[in-house]
Amino acid sequence: HLRNHGFLQTGGTGWSLSPLFDVNPTPEDIRPRYLNTAIDWEDTSASLDVLLSIAPECGIKTSETNDLLEPIARAVSQWRQVAESFGISKQEQDRMASAFEHADGYSAVLT
């Protein structure tokens, strides 16, 4: 919701808005992939197509979208390694996989 904002301290210079905050990955069998705060009037699905379609409305040129999405996709693509480093079992990782591994996920951006 709109009150979900986070700030990062930027050394001794102050604060900056966090690029990501309060993101809760949920497996698709628990909740379908849709946005509670819709970014498109007609389609509330959490999809790469919807994200790309509204980029110009956010002042982002189509040619810039991949440059912005690629670092995020690379980070998300390492989710299993990060989970393992925190001692999360393979069974638990498999349970969460549909929250990270889907057609509109990091593999679509990194291809």
Functional labels for PLM-detected ranges:
Residues 1-111:
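Anionic ligand-binding catalytic core segments
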